[in-house]
Structure formats: C-alpha cells, structure tokens
C-alpha cells in the first residue's frame, strides 16, 4: 500500500510540475522551433499580401466599372465579393480532404504558385489601356480557390512542427499573425495605391 501511495503522489507531483512548467511558457515559445517560425513568417507575409490584393482589386474594379459605364460600380464590387465567396464554399469539403491526405508542404508550394500567377496576371492587366473586368473576376476566383486549399493545409501542418504542449501557443501566434496582417495589409495597400497605383501592390 505504501508503494502504491508513493507512486500516486509521485504521479500527481509530476503532473503538477508539468502544468507549472507549461504555465511558464514564453508567449513566443513556438517561435523557437525553426520550421514553425518559417511557417509563421510566411503566413504573416502571405496574409498581408492577400489583404493588400483585396484592396487593390476593389479599387481597380471600381475604377474600371466607373470608366467603362457598362456596369454600376457598386454592383461590380458586390460581384467581387461573390467571386471570392462562392469558391470558398464550393471547395470547403474538398480542400479539407486534400489537406488531410496530400503532402502539405507541396500543397502550400502549389497554392503559393497559384497566388503568384493570379497577382502577376492582375499586375500585367493593370498596365493595359483597357483591363477587361472578366479577367479581374477570373483572377479573383483563382485566388479564392487557392486560398481555400492553402488555409487548411497550413493549419494541418502546425501540429507536425511543434510538440503537443506547445501547440496552443502556436495556434495563438497564428491568430496574432492573421490579426497583424489584416491590419497592416490594407493600410500599406492604401498608401501604395495613393502613391503609385494598383500595379505595384500586385507585384508585392
């Protein structure tokens, strides 16, 4: 009985010690892991770029619709929102399945290439005398599809980069990265568009 009691006390003390250690984790503990740090920085830059592109597309579509006169500018902006939302909903189940079964690093690479193609086409098109609205919508749809696959792949990769006890911290840092990018992206886009137009935003 004494041995069992001692074992139980030891187990409790070990659990308490572990919890205490966990409670003293640095707010940036997950960033000590190189692979997660690279993923986190990539997410910060990628999300900021996405937010910048959203602002640039909205400005470009509004100006094109206003100049062309074939469609009301407010309606044109509403259709942009639809072009972003429909692919996200349509691919929701498929993107989750692919993220679970595919090589997540390869999937992130492919989605990055897709996003680059979308931005490059928009940047090149913005230099045309008349940019077709349909082309802008097509690239918005491509970017939305890419984003639908990128998000679950990135989330599924996180648990493989840090120990289980660090995972809550890693997820919290991901939220912080998203919030920072959501604030900084539109601000930078607005400043850059006011200074040099929409094309430079697409190239960033």
Language-model features, listed with the residues they occupy:
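Alpha-helical transmembrane-bundle signature of multi-pass membrane transport and export proteins
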Residues: 5-204
């Amino acid at each position: 009985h004494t041995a069992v009691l001692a074992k139980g006390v030891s187990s409790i003390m070990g659990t308490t010690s572990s919890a205490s250690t966990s409670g003293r984790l640095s707010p940036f503990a997950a960033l000590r892991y190189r692979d997660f740090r690279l993923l986190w920085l990539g997410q910060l830059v990628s999300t900021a770029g996405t937010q910048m592109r959203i602002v640039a597309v909205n400005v470009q579509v509004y100006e094109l619709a206003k100049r062309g006169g074939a469609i009301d500018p407010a309606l044109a902006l509403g259709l942009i929102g639809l072009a972003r939302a429909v692919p996200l909903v349509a691919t929701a189940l498929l993107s989750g399945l692919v993220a679970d079964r595919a090589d997540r690093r390869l999937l992130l690479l492919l989605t990055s290439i897709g996003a680059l193609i979308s931005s490059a086409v928009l940047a090149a098109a913005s230099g045309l005398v008349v940019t077709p609205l349909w082309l802008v919508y097509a690239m918005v749809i491509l970017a939305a599809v890419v984003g639908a696959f990128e998000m679950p792949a990135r989330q599924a990769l996180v648990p493989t980069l840090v120990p289980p006890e660090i995972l809550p911290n890693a997820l919290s840092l991901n939220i912080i990265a998203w919030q920072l990018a959501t604030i900084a992206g539109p601000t930078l886009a607005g400043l850059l568009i006011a200074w040099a137009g929409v094309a430079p935003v697409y190239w960033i």
